[in-house]
Amino acid sequence: MLAFIFTPWVYSGAYFFAQETKNMNALWTQIAENLTFVLTCLALVVGLALLAKLAEKFLPERRTVTPARRVSIIGICAAIATVLHIMDFAVPFLAPGFYKLDFSELPVLLCGFYLGPCATVVCEGIKILLKLLLKGTSTAFVGDLANFVVGCSFVLPATIWYHVHKSKHSAIIGLTLGTICMSVFGTAFNAVYLIPKFAELYGMPLDAIIGMGTAIHAGIHNITTFVVMCVAPLNVVKGAMVSVLTLLLYKRVARPLFGIRS
Protein backbone atom coordinates (compact mmCIF):
# COMPACT_ATOMS: atom_id res chain seq x y z
CA MET A 1 0.00 0.00 0.00
CA LEU A 2 2.77 2.40 0.95
CA ALA A 3 4.65 1.53 -2.23
CA PHE A 4 1.52 2.30 -4.24
CA ILE A 5 1.22 5.70 -2.55
CA PHE A 6 4.85 6.79 -2.75
CA THR A 7 5.87 5.36 -6.14
CA PRO A 8 4.23 8.20 -8.17
CA TRP A 9 5.93 10.75 -5.93
CA VAL A 10 9.29 9.05 -6.44
CA TYR A 11 8.88 9.07 -10.22
CA SER A 12 7.69 12.70 -10.15
CA GLY A 13 10.66 13.71 -8.04
CA ALA A 14 13.08 11.91 -10.33
CA TYR A 15 11.52 13.53 -13.40
CA PHE A 16 11.64 16.96 -11.76
CA PHE A 17 15.29 16.43 -10.79
CA ALA A 18 16.16 15.32 -14.32
CA GLN A 19 14.44 18.37 -15.81
CA GLU A 20 16.20 20.70 -13.38
CA THR A 21 19.53 19.08 -14.20
CA LYS A 22 18.82 19.51 -17.91
CA ASN A 23 17.85 23.17 -17.41
CA MET A 24 20.97 23.84 -15.34
CA ASN A 25 23.15 22.22 -17.97
CA ALA A 26 21.52 24.39 -20.64
CA LEU A 27 22.03 27.47 -18.45
CA TRP A 28 25.71 26.71 -17.93
CA THR A 29 26.08 26.12 -21.66
CA GLN A 30 24.57 29.55 -22.38
CA ILE A 31 26.82 31.14 -19.77
CA ALA A 32 29.86 29.48 -21.31
CA GLU A 33 28.86 30.64 -24.80
CA ASN A 34 28.27 34.20 -23.63
CA LEU A 35 31.49 34.12 -21.63
CA THR A 36 33.34 33.15 -24.78
CA PHE A 37 31.75 36.11 -26.56
CA VAL A 38 32.67 38.47 -23.71
CA LEU A 39 36.24 37.18 -23.64
CA THR A 40 36.43 37.62 -27.42
CA CYS A 41 35.30 41.22 -27.03
CA LEU A 42 37.88 41.88 -24.32
CA ALA A 43 40.63 40.28 -26.38
CA LEU A 44 39.78 42.48 -29.36
CA VAL A 45 39.71 45.62 -27.20
CA VAL A 46 43.07 44.81 -25.62
CA GLY A 47 44.56 43.89 -28.99
CA LEU A 48 43.48 47.14 -30.61
CA ALA A 49 44.72 49.17 -27.62
CA LEU A 50 48.12 47.47 -27.79
CA LEU A 51 48.29 48.04 -31.56
CA ALA A 52 47.56 51.74 -31.08
CA LYS A 53 50.15 52.03 -28.30
CA LEU A 54 52.76 50.24 -30.40
CA ALA A 55 52.05 52.50 -33.37
CA GLU A 56 52.55 55.63 -31.28
CA LYS A 57 56.05 54.50 -30.31
CA PHE A 58 57.15 54.60 -33.96
CA LEU A 59 55.40 57.84 -34.92
CA PRO A 60 57.13 61.23 -35.05
CA GLU A 61 56.87 63.43 -31.97
CA ARG A 62 53.30 64.48 -31.30
CA ARG A 63 51.82 67.56 -29.66
CA THR A 64 52.43 67.94 -25.95
CA VAL A 65 49.02 67.96 -24.27
CA THR A 66 48.40 68.00 -20.53
CA PRO A 67 46.57 64.96 -19.12
CA ALA A 68 43.59 67.09 -18.10
CA ARG A 69 43.28 68.58 -21.57
CA ARG A 70 43.67 65.16 -23.19
CA VAL A 71 40.86 63.76 -21.03
CA SER A 72 38.59 66.72 -21.79
CA ILE A 73 39.16 66.47 -25.57
CA ILE A 74 38.54 62.72 -25.60
CA GLY A 75 35.44 63.21 -23.45
CA ILE A 76 33.99 65.91 -25.72
CA CYS A 77 34.65 63.92 -28.88
CA ALA A 78 33.26 60.72 -27.33
CA ALA A 79 30.09 62.54 -26.26
CA ILE A 80 29.55 63.93 -29.76
CA ALA A 81 30.29 60.50 -31.24
CA THR A 82 27.71 58.93 -28.91
CA VAL A 83 25.01 61.34 -30.07
CA LEU A 84 25.85 60.64 -33.72
CA HIS A 85 25.89 56.90 -33.02
CA ILE A 86 22.43 57.03 -31.42
CA MET A 87 21.18 58.92 -34.49
CA ASP A 88 22.03 55.99 -36.77
CA PHE A 89 19.68 55.05 -39.60
CA ALA A 90 19.01 52.10 -41.85
CA VAL A 91 19.81 52.09 -45.56
CA PRO A 92 17.20 49.59 -46.82
CA PHE A 93 18.33 49.66 -50.44
CA LEU A 94 21.84 48.53 -49.40
CA ALA A 95 21.46 46.17 -46.44
CA PRO A 96 18.87 44.68 -44.03
CA GLY A 97 17.47 46.96 -41.34
CA PHE A 98 19.69 45.73 -38.50
CA TYR A 99 22.66 47.24 -40.36
CA LYS A 100 22.78 50.95 -39.57
CA LEU A 101 24.77 53.85 -40.99
CA ASP A 102 26.08 56.56 -38.70
CA PHE A 103 28.74 59.25 -38.68
CA SER A 104 30.09 58.61 -35.18
CA GLU A 105 33.62 58.00 -36.50
CA LEU A 106 33.84 61.67 -37.54
CA PRO A 107 34.57 63.11 -34.05
CA VAL A 108 36.72 60.04 -33.29
CA LEU A 109 38.88 60.86 -36.32
CA LEU A 110 39.10 64.53 -35.33
CA CYS A 111 40.23 63.42 -31.88
CA GLY A 112 42.76 60.98 -33.35
CA PHE A 113 44.18 63.48 -35.81
CA TYR A 114 44.90 65.79 -32.89
CA LEU A 115 45.92 63.37 -30.12
CA GLY A 116 47.07 60.21 -31.90
CA PRO A 117 46.03 56.56 -32.36
CA CYS A 118 45.52 55.65 -28.68
CA ALA A 119 42.96 58.42 -28.31
CA THR A 120 40.89 56.93 -31.14
CA VAL A 121 40.59 53.55 -29.40
CA VAL A 122 39.67 55.18 -26.09
CA CYS A 123 37.16 57.47 -27.80
CA GLU A 124 35.57 54.53 -29.66
CA GLY A 125 35.32 52.53 -26.44
CA ILE A 126 33.71 55.36 -24.46
CA LYS A 127 31.26 55.93 -27.31
CA ILE A 128 30.07 52.32 -27.19
CA LEU A 129 29.79 52.30 -23.38
CA LEU A 130 27.77 55.53 -23.35
CA LYS A 131 25.51 54.24 -26.12
CA LEU A 132 24.82 51.04 -24.16
CA LEU A 133 24.02 53.04 -21.02
CA LEU A 134 21.68 55.41 -22.87
CA LYS A 135 20.05 53.10 -25.41
CA GLY A 136 20.97 49.52 -24.58
CA THR A 137 21.46 46.95 -27.32
CA SER A 138 19.09 45.60 -29.96
CA THR A 139 21.57 43.14 -31.49
CA ALA A 140 22.60 40.99 -28.48
CA PHE A 141 25.75 43.19 -28.22
CA VAL A 142 27.06 41.86 -31.55
CA GLY A 143 26.30 45.13 -33.33
CA ASP A 144 28.07 47.07 -30.58
CA LEU A 145 31.16 44.89 -30.89
CA ALA A 146 31.01 45.32 -34.67
CA ASN A 147 30.76 49.09 -34.41
CA PHE A 148 33.78 49.24 -32.12
CA VAL A 149 36.06 46.82 -33.95
CA VAL A 150 35.12 47.82 -37.50
CA GLY A 151 35.23 51.48 -36.48
CA CYS A 152 38.77 51.01 -35.15
CA SER A 153 39.76 49.30 -38.40
CA PHE A 154 38.83 52.60 -40.09
CA VAL A 155 40.12 55.25 -37.70
CA LEU A 156 43.38 53.57 -36.64
CA PRO A 157 44.98 53.26 -40.12
CA ALA A 158 43.78 56.76 -41.03
CA THR A 159 45.15 58.28 -37.83
CA ILE A 160 48.46 56.42 -37.94
CA TRP A 161 49.12 57.43 -41.55
CA TYR A 162 48.15 61.04 -40.91
CA HIS A 163 50.60 61.33 -38.01
CA VAL A 164 53.49 60.19 -40.20
CA HIS A 165 53.55 63.50 -42.11
CA LYS A 166 50.60 65.62 -40.88
CA SER A 167 49.56 67.15 -44.17
CA LYS A 168 46.37 67.30 -46.18
CA HIS A 169 47.85 64.85 -48.68
CA SER A 170 48.72 62.47 -45.84
CA ALA A 171 45.20 62.83 -44.45
CA ILE A 172 43.68 61.92 -47.82
CA ILE A 173 45.89 58.85 -48.14
CA GLY A 174 45.20 57.84 -44.54
CA LEU A 175 41.43 58.17 -44.90
CA THR A 176 41.52 56.23 -48.16
CA LEU A 177 43.59 53.51 -46.51
CA GLY A 178 41.20 53.47 -43.55
CA THR A 179 38.18 53.08 -45.82
CA ILE A 180 39.84 50.17 -47.63
CA CYS A 181 40.82 48.48 -44.35
CA MET A 182 37.32 48.92 -42.92
CA SER A 183 35.70 47.56 -46.06
CA VAL A 184 37.95 44.50 -46.30
CA PHE A 185 38.16 43.72 -42.59
CA GLY A 186 34.50 44.52 -41.90
CA THR A 187 33.37 42.26 -44.73
CA ALA A 188 35.55 39.35 -43.62
CA PHE A 189 34.79 39.80 -39.90
CA ASN A 190 31.05 39.81 -40.59
CA ALA A 191 31.26 36.61 -42.63
CA VAL A 192 33.55 34.69 -40.31
CA TYR A 193 32.32 35.77 -36.87
CA LEU A 194 29.74 38.54 -36.48
CA ILE A 195 26.82 37.23 -38.54
CA PRO A 196 27.05 33.62 -37.26
CA LYS A 197 27.37 34.92 -33.67
CA PHE A 198 24.43 37.29 -34.17
CA ALA A 199 22.31 34.42 -35.45
CA GLU A 200 23.34 32.29 -32.47
CA LEU A 201 22.84 34.86 -29.70
CA TYR A 202 19.73 36.43 -31.19
CA GLY A 203 18.13 33.05 -31.93
CA MET A 204 17.69 33.77 -35.62
CA PRO A 205 18.42 31.15 -38.30
CA LEU A 206 21.33 32.09 -40.55
CA ASP A 207 19.17 31.34 -43.59
CA ALA A 208 16.68 33.97 -42.41
CA ILE A 209 19.42 36.61 -42.35
CA ILE A 210 20.59 35.63 -45.81
CA GLY A 211 16.97 35.75 -46.95
CA MET A 212 16.76 39.39 -45.82
CA GLY A 213 19.68 40.13 -48.11
CA THR A 214 18.11 38.21 -50.98
CA ALA A 215 15.02 40.41 -50.66
CA ILE A 216 17.27 43.40 -51.46
CA HIS A 217 19.70 41.84 -53.93
CA ALA A 218 18.56 38.79 -55.87
CA GLY A 219 22.15 37.64 -56.32
CA ILE A 220 22.58 36.88 -52.60
CA HIS A 221 22.36 33.16 -51.88
CA ASN A 222 24.94 32.52 -49.12
CA ILE A 223 26.89 34.36 -46.44
CA THR A 224 29.73 35.26 -48.82
CA THR A 225 27.49 36.99 -51.35
CA PHE A 226 25.61 38.58 -48.44
CA VAL A 227 28.66 40.36 -47.03
CA VAL A 228 30.03 41.26 -50.48
CA MET A 229 26.76 42.80 -51.70
CA CYS A 230 25.43 44.25 -48.42
CA VAL A 231 28.18 44.81 -45.88
CA ALA A 232 31.02 45.93 -48.16
CA PRO A 233 29.04 48.66 -49.99
CA LEU A 234 27.74 50.00 -46.67
CA ASN A 235 31.27 50.28 -45.30
CA VAL A 236 32.52 51.94 -48.48
CA VAL A 237 29.71 54.52 -48.36
CA LYS A 238 30.33 55.22 -44.67
CA GLY A 239 34.09 55.51 -45.15
CA ALA A 240 33.75 57.85 -48.11
CA MET A 241 31.22 60.14 -46.44
CA VAL A 242 33.07 60.34 -43.11
CA SER A 243 36.37 60.92 -44.95
CA VAL A 244 34.97 63.85 -46.92
CA LEU A 245 33.45 65.39 -43.79
CA THR A 246 36.73 64.96 -41.89
CA LEU A 247 38.72 66.74 -44.60
CA LEU A 248 36.19 69.57 -44.68
CA LEU A 249 35.86 70.02 -40.93
CA TYR A 250 39.18 69.17 -39.26
CA LYS A 251 40.96 72.50 -39.62
CA ARG A 252 37.75 74.43 -38.96
CA VAL A 253 36.89 72.41 -35.86
CA ALA A 254 40.48 72.23 -34.59
CA ARG A 255 40.62 75.97 -33.95
CA PRO A 256 37.64 76.36 -31.58
CA LEU A 257 37.64 72.83 -30.13
CA PHE A 258 41.34 72.11 -29.72
CA GLY A 259 42.63 75.68 -29.57
CA ILE A 260 45.19 75.31 -32.36
CA ARG A 261 45.98 77.43 -35.38
CA SER A 262 47.46 74.84 -37.73
Where do the PLM segments sit?
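Loop-helix junctions at membrane interfaces
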Residues: A3-S262
